[in-house]
C-alpha cells in the first residue's frame, strides 16, 4: 500500500489532533500589556465586543476604564480621554465604546467583567440620547452586542441570580439574540430561585 498520496491527509489530521489537545490558556496569553497600550483609545470592535482585552484590562491596575458612546469618539477638549490625559492622571484612560452603544450594550460589557469589578474604579457615561421611547434598536443590538460577552456574563460566579434573570429577560426581547433556547432555559430556571 502506498502512503504517499495519503501523507498530506495524515499530517493534517495529526496537526488537527495536536491543536485539539492544546490548553486554551496558551492562546489567552496573546493579549499582552503592549496590546492594552495599543488599544487604549482605539475604540475598535475587538475592544468593544471582545472579552480577552477587557479581562486583561481589569487584571491590570495601570488603566482607568471609561465606558461610553459617541462622546468617546470626539476629538475635543471635553473628551474624557483627552481631559484626563491633560490632567496627568495617575492612571492612563482606556476607552470602551462606540457610537450607538447604549446602556444595555455597555451594561452587558460590564456584567461580563462582574467578578473582576470588586475594588475597581471606572466611569460609565450615560448619554442623553439613550433615553428614547423605542430604546435600543434591533440594528444597534445586532451591530454591537457580543455573543462572547453574553456567554461570559452568564458564567460570572458572583453575579446574583436575579440579575442574570433580568439580563436574560431583556435579551429575549431582541429577535436576533443568539441562543434563545438557552436564554429561555436560563430565565425559567432562575425564575424558580428569585
Name each model-derived stretch.
Residues 1-5:
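Positively charged n-region of N-terminal signal peptides that target proteins for export
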Residues 28-91, 109:
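Membrane/wall-proximal cationic-aromatic binding patches
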Residues 63-67, 114, 167, 182, ...:
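Sequence-level detector for tyrosine residue identity
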Residues 73-160:
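Membrane-embedded segments
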Residues 144-182:
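Ser/Thr/Gly-rich flexible loops in soluble cytosolic domains mediating phosphotransfer, phosphorylation
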Residues 187-188, 192-193:
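Conserved small/polar residues in nucleotide/adenosyl-binding loops
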Amino acid at each position: 500500500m502506498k502512503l504517499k498520496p495519503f501523507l498530506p491527509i495524515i499530517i493534517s489530521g495529526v496537526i488537527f489532533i495536536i491543536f485539539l489537545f492544546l490548553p486554551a490558556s496558551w492562546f489567552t496569553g496573546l493579549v499582552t500589556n503592549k496590546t492594552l497600550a495599543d488599544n487604549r483609545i482605539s475604540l475598535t470592535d475587538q475592544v468593544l465586543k471582545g472579552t480577552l482585552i477587557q479581562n486583561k484590562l481589569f487584571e491590570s491596575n495601570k488603566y482607568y476604564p471609561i465606558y461610553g458612546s459617541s462622546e468617546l469618539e470626539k476629538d475635543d477638549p471635553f473628551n474624557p480621554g483627552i481631559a484626563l490625559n491633560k490632567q496627568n492622571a495617575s492612571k492612563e484612560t482606556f476607552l470602551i465604546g462606540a457610537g450607538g452603544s447604549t446602556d444595555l450594550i455597555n451594561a452587558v460589557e460590564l456584567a461580563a467583567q462582574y467578578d473582576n469589578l470588586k475594588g475597581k474604579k471606572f466611569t460609565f457615561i450615560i448619554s442623553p440620547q439613550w433615553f428614547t421611547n423605542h430604546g435600543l434598536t434591533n440594528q444597534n443590538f445586532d451591530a454591537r452586542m457580543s455573543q462572547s460577552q453574553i456567554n461570559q456574563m452568564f458564567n460570572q460566579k458572583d453575579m446574583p441570580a436575579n440579575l442574570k434573570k433580568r439580563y436574560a429577560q431583556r435579551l429575549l426581547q431582541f429577535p436576533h439574540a443568539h441562543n434563545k433556547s438557552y436564554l429561555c432555559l436560563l430565565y425559567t430556571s432562575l425564575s424558580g430561585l428569585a
